[in-house]
């Protein structure tokens, strides 16, 4: 429907007909099939005034409740906070815990939501300050520790702000880089490991299918505040870029989290550009809509902490609430 417009020339239905909609008559307008219409007041007391409309609506609702005992089912909404410990018992066991990670619940079914790294090996997370990016990485770390052994998964954490310090205290933690100097020192050994997993000319087709020419854990590189790592002066993680397309073969998973502000420009940075080209998992949390579309068809918007739109090949786009776990 289309109500009275300030300028009939703005009508999407019929400009001439829009000129005939009287001014000062609330509820008058036109329909898409070019008919005049009048919207009725939402009251049942035969009063044609909008005075005390709120009270009249409440009285009408009370009257209807008295006539019938039936009630409409309550609309289930995403909670503003869900504890990771409370969510764990609801999650089904996975036969590939090193590739399927529980992170929260979705809006459609209010059911546990998993990141499917077996289908899409990498992930990008966008969100502004205090939106829950670090909370998501913390939940991922704790879920990996809960469901896997150090022989199945090794974590390489890049955390310049030290917000993930102490989250992983088991042998799952391979390296913890808290500064650029530390990261520069650790990357060469990581690159050598990945290089050793690349299939050589003597690898058979059967070995390629089974991924049996090497053995070892899946490697997860979790990077918080990626905008502090990838600077104009250089990016210590840049050597990883050439291995990203081979991630399923060599057991590599890169998860980067950065602020939404400035992300539209940062998408041209080599590593982020390659991850986007490879159709990685994406989570768009709270951010300024002026940044434009960064993941799928999702435009940033204001969201409560922990809330975001998850973009995955298997599940399309869905709103989720990330499970919260205490920093300590």
Model-derived features: positions:
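P-loop NTPase catalytic phosphate-binding loop
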Residues: 1-2, 6, 94-280, 287
């Amino acid at each position: 429907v289309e109500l009275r417009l300030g300028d009939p020339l703005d009508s999407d239905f019929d400009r001439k007909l829009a000129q005939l909609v009287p001014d000062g008559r609330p509820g008058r307008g036109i329909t898409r099939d070019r008919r005049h219409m009048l919207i009725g007041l939402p009251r049942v007391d035969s009063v044609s005034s909008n005075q005390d409309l709120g009270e009249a609506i409440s009285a009408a609702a009370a009257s209807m409740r008295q006539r019938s005992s039936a009630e409409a089912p309550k609309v289930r909404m995403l909670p503003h906070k869900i504890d990771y410990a409370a969510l764990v018992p609801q999650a089904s066991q996975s036969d590939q815990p090193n590739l399927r990670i529980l992170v929260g619940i979705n809006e459609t079914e209010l059911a546990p939501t998993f990141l499917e790294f077996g289908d899409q090996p990498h992930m990008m997370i966008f969100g502004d300050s205090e939106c829950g990016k670090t909370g998501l990485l913390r939940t991922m770390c704790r879920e990996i520790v809960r469901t896997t052994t150090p022989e199945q998964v090794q974590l390489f954490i890049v955390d310049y702000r030290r917000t993930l310090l102490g989250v992983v205290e088991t042998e799952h933690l391979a390296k913890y880089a808290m500064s650029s100097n530390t990261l520069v020192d650790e990357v060469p050994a990581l690159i050598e490991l990945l290089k050793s997993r690349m299939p050589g000319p003597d690898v058979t087709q059967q070995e390629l299918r089974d991924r049996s020419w090497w053995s070892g854990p899946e490697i997860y590189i979790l990077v918080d505040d990626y905008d502090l790592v990838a600077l104009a002066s250089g990016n210590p993680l840049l050597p990883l870029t050439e291995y990203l397309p081979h991630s399923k073969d060599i057991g590599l998973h890169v998860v980067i989290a950065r602020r939404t502000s400035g992300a539209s420009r940062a998408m041209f940075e080599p590593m982020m550009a390659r991850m986007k080209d490879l159709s990685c998992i994406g989570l768009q949390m709270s951010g300024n809509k002026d940044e434009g579309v960064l993941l799928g068809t999702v435009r940033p918007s204001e969201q409560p902490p922990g809330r975001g739109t998850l973009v995955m090949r298997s599940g399309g786009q869905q709103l989720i609430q990330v499970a919260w776990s205490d920093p300590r």
